Amino acid sequence: MKELAIIGTTASGKTALSLEIANKTNSIILSLDSLCVYKEIDIASAKPTKIERGDIVHFGIDEVFPNEKFDVIEFLNLYKNAKEYAEKNMKNLIIVGGTGFYLKALVDGISDGLKENTNLDMSLNDAYNLLYSLDKDYMQKIEPNDKYRVEKAYSIYKQSGLTPSEYFLKNPKIALSPNLPIFEILWEKDELINRISLRTKQMIKSGLIDETIYLEKKYTRAPNCMSSIGIIETLEYLDGKIDKKSLEDKIIQNTLKLAKRQNTFNKGQFTNRVSNIIPSLNSEIIKYFSI
């Protein structure tokens, strides 16, 4: 059994490439996407349809309902299940998606022992400043408005009595797949902008507004996934704050910002990745599986 990861910015063609390669290499797929895990979020997540998936076994798609918890721990458990299935059935494993934080946890590991995040008993800014005063080396790697990571660092401090640096020193990370080969899809900026624009138009045409109305009615706006790109802008449209043209433009702009963040993260975190355009990457991956 061989395994690898395919990454790239949103709308880069990761899903199509993974499906094509999986069909050629006797592989199953683990989705590396924090939105595809949710049932009933089909259009906003741009998840592959059942027809597109065909006979290829997928993990990480339609795993939980929007009001249910899913985080990096659940993802790592999914990885274990997917790998066990692949080994048992003599399949290869392709991990594909744009949630780089999950992939980083897979190749670098996370520390065990913490409960769920401790709720902040002060403002996000105050919590950041407190932690910065206690552990400058660790906190200067985190943006002050990064709510998830600030809350995680604060939880470490409140639950363990240790600064994050002290905690990780005493609780070293354990990686599940430290030597995972990572392949990254590259696009020229103008081409990626065009792909994002076309996908956004298709999402709206396919029923994004109706999907969002359904999700809000069934789950309210409380779940974290209701703040995802595509959904949050559609809620603004439904509130009468923006018109339909602005809805499209805003989704495109926010998706472009996401793509920029993903690109920066991938460059900074996965230094041993192989990056190329799709045709060349396809050949390199097929070659890897054939060795």
Stretches with model-predicted labels:
Residues M1-I291:
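Phosphate/pyrophosphate-binding catalytic cores of soluble transferases and nucleic-acid-acting enzymes
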